[in-house]
Amino acid sequence: MAFYELRQYKVWPGKMDEWVSFMEKEIIPFQISKGMVITGSFRGEEDDSTYIWLRRFEDEKSREKLYADVYESDQWKNEIAHRIPELLDREGMIVTRIVPTPKSTSQ
């Protein structure tokens, strides 16, 4: 059964525009190139520290493969991962697995 990850991040003060640019120009295109399905990304309308994005997985096996393809890659380790802590409070990261309700259009 398909499920989503609702990923909520706390962006360091004054870093939201830089974070959004990094996500939209580097992280999201890279993850999509590895097969990740990104269904949306959002920033807080009134809270400039809140960034949320959604990723969809067909099942746990595909999630595990995609995680390995992304996070164990040389590009992630050498070009992307080290830049994240200067933009995000990793302690404030919340990842919630969610499933669509029966009548949801997000099956």
Protein language model annotation of sequence segments:
Residues 98-105:
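Specificity-determining recognition surfaces
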Residues 13-15, 59-61, 101:
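Residues that cap or initiate secondary-structure elements
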Residues 4, 8, 49-62:
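Accessory recognition modules or surfaces
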Residues 43-44:
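Short beta-strand micro-motifs enriched in acidic
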